[in-house]
């Protein structure tokens, strides 16, 4: 049994040896020969490029697998000349600049331990520089000096802890301030949005003189278009230039209760032409009046103070304020004092509300009875009893 096992072991060993030292077959050797030929061509090409670029003499001597000699350059005379010159050099010059593979590997193995030791020293020095654990100067310190050093280190440690707490607290306060500022900005933004929404719901009322009614206009309509303008002013409400008036109250509304009425008013060529309803709706140029209240309004009590049946109550003047406009003194405080009227023409119009006659060159009328009301006919006579 043992003999059989030993024989089998020897057989396997011999078989392995035969397999390990087996000569390469012809196919394998041919591939290697092909690879060698390609490598030789590459080496010869590089030698040629090197000789051209560096302008030097280059020689390559190579023996093939079959012992055949191949050189570059192919001219054998040039190869022999280069080899002769190289042989004439001394041993030192021959070794100069030459590289031997065996020597190169030995040098690399010799340098590696030195480099490793340098790296280890560098690694050991870095922690000592960053975090020194001991100083050689402490070796000669006494116990008292070492205790003082410990106390100094403790004081510095306490100071650093206080500083750290102060920095952390300051950062917390800054964070709270930033949070408060952000909340305030958010509240302001919400407030502005609420105000804007509220303004969109608010509307304004405008009096329309054309149809005598209020019209409701949202403020948002005006705010959305800043360039949008209001409707043009009707011609009947326009105030022409060169008018000096202290007060226009009542010119578009109900009669006021002005104290002065018209004082010392010079009226030149005031034309009331073809007025269907009231007086002409334009104020004469170069007219001076302290108060225009109740020019277009009705009497406060709604009664017709004039006995002219052609005048409706809506065109009556406020006799308490401007009753003297046509030369009639009302019950106002001042009426018309020292009033000169020149060429005041109420052109014969078809209206049944105003005065349908002309009054030309009335003399100066000094008011003495301020509590009387006069009604004049077409000749300028008073038709109302005093």
From Swiss-Prot:
It comes from the Eukaryota. One of its GO terms (molecular function) is DNA-binding transcription factor activity, RNA polymerase II-specific. The keyword DNA-binding applies. It is found in: Nucleus. Keywords: DNA-binding, Nucleus, Transcription, Transcription regulation. GO terms for cellular component: nucleus. Residues 29-76 form the MADS-box domain. SUPFAM superfamilies: SRF-like. GO terms for biological process: positive regulation of transcription by RNA polymerase II. Its main location: nucleus. CDD domains: MADS_SRF_like. Gene3D superfamilies: Transcription factor, MADS-box (3.40.1810.10). Probable transcription factor that may function in the maintenance of the proper function of the central cell in pollen tube attraction. Interacts with MEE14/CBP1. This is Agamous-like MADS-box protein AGL103. It comes from Arabidopsis thaliana (Mouse-ear cress).
């Amino acid at each position: 049994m043992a003999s059989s096992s030993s024989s089998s072991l020897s057989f396997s060993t011999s078989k392995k040896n035969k397999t390990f030292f087996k000569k390469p077959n012809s196919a394998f050797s041919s591939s290697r020969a092909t690879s060698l030929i390609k490598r030789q061509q590459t080496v010869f090409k590089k030698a040629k490029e090197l000789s051209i670029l560096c302008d030097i003499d280059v020689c390559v001597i190579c023996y093939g697998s079959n012992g055949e000699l191949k050189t570059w350059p192919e001219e054998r005379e040039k190869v022999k000349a280069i080899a002769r010159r190289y042989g004439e050099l001394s041993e030192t010059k021959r070794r100069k600049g030459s590289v031997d593979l065996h020597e190169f590997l030995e040098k690399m193995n010799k340098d590696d331990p030195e480099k490793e030791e340098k790296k280890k020293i560098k690694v050991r020095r870095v922690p000592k520089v960053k975090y020194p654990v001991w100083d050689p100067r402490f070796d000669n310190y006494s116990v008292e000096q070492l205790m003082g050093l410990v106390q100094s280190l403790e004081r510095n440690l306490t100071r650093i802890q206080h500083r750290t707490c102060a920095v952390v607290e300051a950062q917390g306060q800054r964070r709270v301030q930033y949070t408060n500022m952000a909340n305030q900005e958010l509240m302001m933004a919400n407030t502005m949005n609420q105000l804007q929404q509220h303004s969109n719901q608010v509307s304004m009322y405008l009096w329309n003189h054309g149809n005598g009614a209020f019209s409701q206009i949202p403020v948002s309509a005006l705010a959305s278009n800043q360039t949008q303008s209001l409707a043009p002013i009707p011609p009947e409400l326009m105030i022409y230039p060169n008018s000096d008036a202290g007060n226009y109250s009542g010119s578009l509304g109900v009669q006021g209760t002005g104290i002065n009425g018209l004082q010392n008013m010079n009226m030149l060529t005031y034309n009331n032409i073809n007025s269907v309803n009231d007086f002409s709706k334009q104020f004469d140029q170069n007219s001076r009046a302290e108060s225009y209240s109740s020019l277009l309004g009705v009497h406060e009590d709604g009664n017709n103070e004039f006995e002219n049946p052609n005048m409706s109550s809506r065109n009556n003047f406020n006799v308490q304020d401007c009753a003297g406009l046509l030369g009639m003194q009302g019950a106002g405080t001042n009426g018309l004092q020292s009033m000169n009227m020149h060429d005041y023409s109420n052109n014969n119009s078809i209206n049944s509300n105003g005065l349908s006659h002309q009054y030309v060159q009335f003399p100066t009328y000094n008011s003495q009875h301020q509590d009387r009301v006069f009604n004049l006919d077409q000749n300028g006579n008073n038709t109302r009893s005093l």
